[in-house]
Amino acid sequence: MIRISEAAQSHFKKLLADQPDGTCIRVFVVNPGMANAECGVSYCPPDSVEPDDERLPFNGFDAVVDSGSAPFLEDAAIDFEEQEMGSQLTLKAPNAKARKVADDAPLIERVEYVIQAEINPQLASHGGQVMISEITDDGVAILQFGGGCNGCSMIDVTLKNGIEKELLERFPEEVKGVRDITDHEPGEHSYY
């Protein structure tokens, strides 16, 4: 479920040495499966461990994950790096914004996962997002843009050079193209 590097394990062990015996670390996701999902790590006193928490043993400490966060922390990794300018703890959780789907899930679910987990985080930096409305019988993904993407003058570049290229590479036998059905209205909300 969660990989914690040796350096991060050592860091947590040092931090937990100053806490009451039995204190764990809790790894969690706030707003799991949503575009605004946030991951975090906190101390978890022994009396805060819930019966349905998943307990993960590591070198000298345990990590706990609540049942609501667990599916969204699949393939998560925590690392700790010391650099000249200081140290940094990183938590990468590729499934925090969208629950990972099985390889044999329906095509629309697999495409939706790629959109939520990989494409929308990039569009969010411009205040935008894209949603899939359907996939036609001939393999065309029908998309609708919102936020800063609605009315953006660069939408054709984003659609063809970004999203279509990614989906064709990921699903070469199933997706044949993309089509934008957004009623684009340029305004102050538009990125460009």
Curated annotation (Swiss-Prot):
Self-association and partners: Homodimer.
Functional description taken from the UniProt entry: Involved in iron-sulfur cluster biogenesis. Binds a 4Fe-4S cluster, can transfer this cluster to apoproteins, and thereby intervenes in the maturation of Fe/S proteins. Could also act as a scaffold/chaperone for damaged Fe/S proteins.
Protein family per UniProt: Belongs to the NfuA family.
Species of provenance: Idiomarina loihiensis (strain ATCC BAA-735 / DSM 15497 / L2-TR)
NCBIfam families, per the entry: PRK11190.1, YhgI_GntY
Swiss-Prot/TrEMBL cofactor(s): [4Fe-4S] cluster
Stretches that traverse the bilayer: none
Name of the featured protein: Fe/S biogenesis protein NfuA
Domain of life: Bacteria
Signal peptide (residue range): none
Gene Ontology biological-process entries: iron-sulfur cluster assembly; protein maturation
